[in-house]
């Protein structure tokens, strides 16, 4: 289970616990004690929209940071590298390398992007 799945699971549990707390105790900050228990179900629509928004933002964040924390072994150096664009891709099943550890081209023989 990846971190993103765990994060989504925890967010869902948080809002479900808020919903059940509202239904049972009726003393949430959003509702007063004089309101009926059925009113709490209307809060679920708000939480549902909020969860959808967070999941959409989280999926965009996944795509933008998918390769940012990948480990780089170029030139026998192990460290973190930041991608040159927001979503690096696979081309010919070889990962593009965007880091500062690349060796300079020798006599300008090749202008291709060095690959791992």
Swiss-Prot record:
Keywords: DNA replication, Plasmid. GO terms for biological process: DNA replication. Putative control of replication message. This is Protein cop. It comes from Staphylococcus aureus.
